Amino acid sequence: MAEHPPLLDTTQILSSDISLLSAPIVSADGTQQVILVQVNPGEAFTIRREDGQFQCITGPAQVPMMSPNGSVPPIYVPPGYAPQVIEDNGVRRVVVVPQAPEFHPGSHTVLHRSPHPPLPGFIPVPTMMPPPPRHMYSPVTGAGDMTTQYMPQYQSSQVYGDVDAHSTHGRSNFRDERSSKTYERLQKKLKDRQGTQKDKMSSPPSSPQKCPSPINEHNGLIKGQIAGGINTGSAKIKSGKGKGGTQVDTEIEEKDEETKAFEALLSNIVKPVASDIQARTVVLTWSPPSSLINGETDESSVPELYGYEVLISSTGKDGKYKSVYVGEETNITLNDLKPAMDYHAKVQAEYNSIKGTPSEAEIFTTLSCEPDIPNPPRIANRTKNSLTLQWKAPSDNGSKIQNFVLEWDEGKGNGEFCQCYMGSQKQFKITKLSPAMGCKFRLSARNDYGTSGFSEEVLYYTSGCAPSMPASPVLTKAGITWLSLQWSKPSGTPSDEGISYILEMEEETSGYGFKPKYDGEDLAYTVKNLRRSTKYKFKVIAYNSEGKSNPSEVVEFTTCPDKPGIPVKPSVKGKIHSHSFKITWDPPKDNGGATINKYVVEMAEGSNGNKWEMIYSGATREHLCDRLNPGCFYRLRVYCISDGGQSAVSESLLVQTPAVPPGPCLPPRLQGRPKAKEIQLRWGPPLVDGGSPISCYSVEMSPIEKDEPREVYQGSEVECTVSSLLPGKTYSFRLRAANKMGFGPFSEKCDITTAPGPPDQCKPPQVTCRSATCAQVNWEVPLSNGTDVTEYRLEWGGVEGSMQICYCGPGLSYEIKGLSPATTYYCRVQALSVVGAGPFSEVVACVTPPSVPGIVTCLQEISDDEIENPHYSPSTCLAISWEKPCDHGSEILAYSIDFGDKQSLTVGKVTSYIINNLQPDTTYRIRIQALNSLGAGPFSHMIKLKTKPLPPDPPRLECVAFSHQNLKLKWGEGTPKTLSTDSIQYHLQMEDKNGRFVSLYRGPCHTYKVQRLNESTSYKFCIQACNEAGEGPLSQEYIFTTPKSVPAALKAPKIEKVNDHICEITWECLQPMKGDPVIYSLQVMLGKDSEFKQIYKGPDSSFRYSSLQLNCEYRFRVCAIRQCQDSLGHQDLVGPYSTTVLFISQRTEPPASTNRDTVESTRTRRALSDEQCAAVILVLFAFFSILIAFIIQYFVIK
């Protein structure tokens, strides 16, 4: 077994901060039981074996331990943790959780340094012993064999007892049948592997990067799990790390059976095979894990690709293993190995963060080679004529070193070496050398495999004579009580020669001469405990084994002076003035050993001011403080500066300057707008109050043309109102302030003008018409009333009450352009100043001279529909219209129409004209101008018009059907068949009430039905034909007359039974129709007769029918008859009959009211039945109409 690191002192670990958790677990029969102690990756567990030796087990590992008395050793609880008992499936566990929510494991480092005392009360199973760890930890400690040195610490710890394995409720630990069988099969496979591979469980720790172990170590804290064996409970100590810090997982998670089975598969891996073994390299090859365990195939799916981790150890089979490879390859080459070294290599399989148990260790030994390069030889002794060198043997790399080869350059320094010794000894003496001679040496080693490389070259000197006189020491830095000195080696001294130095010092006032202050090999020394500002003499002596040198030349250095003491408090010298005073002060009692170079005076304003400013710096001890403010407090202090530094400040002197009258104020300012007779002034305090508060103000006023000031206000307020002033007048004001010392000077004058009045009314302006479109307006300056006129406003317009501003400015004239000729215009002018606007002048009217007419606008063609001239023909005529232009003051006499002929056409004062005698289908360019007595106006814009071809003749119009509201007209009969193929459009017109013909129809059809006409009314119609050539002439007027209308249908009559043989029939009454009387015809049909018989005809709206028979059905209906009287004679127009009403005559039963009600209800029910019948017919008709329309839309149109 390889050497283990010695155990540290365990007393460093066991402190009172770690509480003790005792977890005894006793089985039911009280016999011995196996306890599994789980060790986390990177942690260690120290135990005592049967032979009495200690062993540290590194994680991850589970150490089975046998408890002779059925109890678990005490468990140390980290500071800030507390145990908690939880129950899971009938098993109680003790879990260590943090006491505070903000527990941070970084504050607990007590377990980093040394392991706990060993556990003597438990015997570990030999097959579960891992190699010694890097860090040794012990989560459990025996309580029975604890030595007395730990007892005081344990007395202050809290001990928590574990609970029984079975709960008090009688619940037992259970698994379902499938999980139980899988667990037993895995346990059997694990035991079989332990039987064939004795040292399987003592494998080194795997890589802690992705270890699935539930035990972690954070900042040195131990989190372990103690799982009980068969029929035992378990205790678990665990803490995790969350987002914000360390969190403790109080839940106990168990791996599912599939994960356990997969771990067993990953553990079934054979050891690697070493090949191509060299001195410093080796090739390792291995195979993936086998899916067969003891002849059985694992039920879990076998992955195609594994991850592997290779672990090697050079300290024995149970030594410390380290990870050298992590990847998916099955062979690697290890480099940087040590020659002739025994190595143990293991491989561990991994898949999806699940790791198996490492394989068995493959043992291989690297080959031997030449020795390593030795270290340079070191000098053991030197004289004037010899050097004795020694060296240490390097690593022999598996073969014993036979000879050492020592080479030197013979003191020549040319870089050429020769052998001076070869042998097995480790020292050699070189003789016959010269004093102070320098030689270079190098060393190599030789064994059976070859010679190593040479070591680094070293230079050594032989001893010489006594040292020469060194140079004088140099001052590097001086202090108040110390001096730092430095010196150098004497010239010609070998670099490796050991020389010592003696530093001697003499104080000039002591009289004792030079005394040694330092004796050693250093080249610098600081002499302390000196006096300030004092001169000291120094010299240095060098010596070696041969003797002492002569002393160096004496040098003299002076210590620094100390800072001076605090100066005396300054005092006032002479009288204190308002703006200055003089102060003086005395020097400090202690000047610090140096002359005072200067004094600095600082001053702060205010009795408690802390803002100090330097006002003086110099050697004199008095100063004049000037440029001060009257009536203010000032604090003064002084400090001094010498070569030793700056002293502290003295006590402060408080001085107050006397007050003076205040300084001048700023001129008063106007507040608000000035009024005509008063102004309001406001001012502020003076910038300088003279050191005393302002008590009052005085305001004086004088007219600007006279310098006769008079006081208008005196008081403490900062504003006043001055009244009784003249408007538009300028006044001068000045101000002064007063305090307890009197009035100060006046301020500068401030000129303020009272509010002026608006300007006076301007005189009527003068208007001069320069042309028909331009006029010049002039006006004069009115009285300004205290202010200058800034601008004038000229209003101009064609209506006296509606004028607009056409000019606004300082000028006295304005030219208005763009006027209309022969037009009356009105104008007025107004003056404005900064105060306001004066009244307008009187209104002046002017008339511009007349001119030629304006340009004719809106020249356009008149459409054929708008022309009422019967002689108009679009083929030979063109109708134009225009708007009358402005006559510009002279009446328009005529218009001149230019349409392309050599001579223009002149027409009278009209706005439309028909140009006749033109050529059909010809384009003409037409323009027009107006003429008056002054001449012709400009031509209008030109338009292009074209005459139409000759149109067809109108057809003959006739009435083919008529009613009292409709007339159906037809045309086109008798037309030649050749025209039937032409695309002729027809335009039907009818005369309205005003005697004008309006359009009724325009289209290709030959019939048209005129609707919504009045009865017995004559209407005039005319028609014209149109084709591509244009519209033909209108036909002659045709007159058609509508007949009179018949009365409307009446509602169903109402029947009321009078007695068994008489009933009364009533119906609605109609008004006379246009003066024609209306009579009624009542018909009845008895029983099953097929014809109605008239029983009444007359103007009444009711009739009593007295021929009723019992138990018979009667049907009644009525119609209205219009009696007309015209030129043809008397004529009756019979309207449609009403709805038939059924009446059944029955014998009247007493009481009479009951029978009447029965007849009434019967009549009503019959009437309602007929109405319902009509409604049903109407609904059915609407439904069929919609259905037919849908069919036509879907099958015909689409």
Curated annotation (Swiss-Prot):
Statement: the UniProt record of this protein carries the keyword Lipid metabolism: no
Keywords, sorted A to Z: Acetylation, Golgi apparatus, Membrane, Phosphoprotein, Repeat, Transmembrane, Transmembrane helix
Record PROSITE patterns: FN3 (PS50853)
Subcellular location: Golgi apparatus membrane
Membrane topology of this protein: Single-pass membrane protein
GO terms (BP aspect): cell-cell adhesion; fertilization; Sertoli cell development; spermatid development
Biased composition (Basic and acidic residues): 163-201
Tissue-specificity statement: Expressed in the odontoblast and nerves in the dental pulp. Also expressed in trachea and to a lesser extent in the brain, liver, lung and kidney.
Domain Fibronectin type-III: 268-369, 373-465, 469-562, 566-660, 664-757, 761-851, 861-950, 951-1045, 1046-1151
Entry coiled-coil feature ranges: none
Region Disordered, annotated ranges: 160-221
Modified residues (N6-acetyllysine): K384
Residues annotated as transmembrane: 1177-1197
GO molecular function, one term: RNA binding
InterPro entries to which the protein is assigned, alphabetical: E3_ligase_FN3/SPRY (IPR050617), FN3_dom (IPR003961), FN3_sf (IPR036116), Ig-like_fold (IPR013783)
Residues where Phosphoserine is found: S203, S207, S213
Gene Ontology CC terms, in alphabetical order: acrosomal vesicle; cytoplasm; cytosol; Golgi apparatus; Golgi membrane; intracellular membrane-bounded organelle; membrane; vesicle membrane
Compositional bias of kind Low complexity: 202-214
Keyword Repeat: yes
PANTHER family per UniProt: E3 UBIQUITIN-PROTEIN LIGASE TRIM36-RELATED, FIBRONECTIN TYPE III DOMAIN CONTAINING 3C2-RELATED
Function: Mediates spermatid-Sertoli adhesion during spermatogenesis.
Family as reported in the entry's similarity comment: Belongs to the FNDC3 family.
The protein's name: Fibronectin type-III domain-containing protein 3A
Source organism of the structure: Homo sapiens (Human)
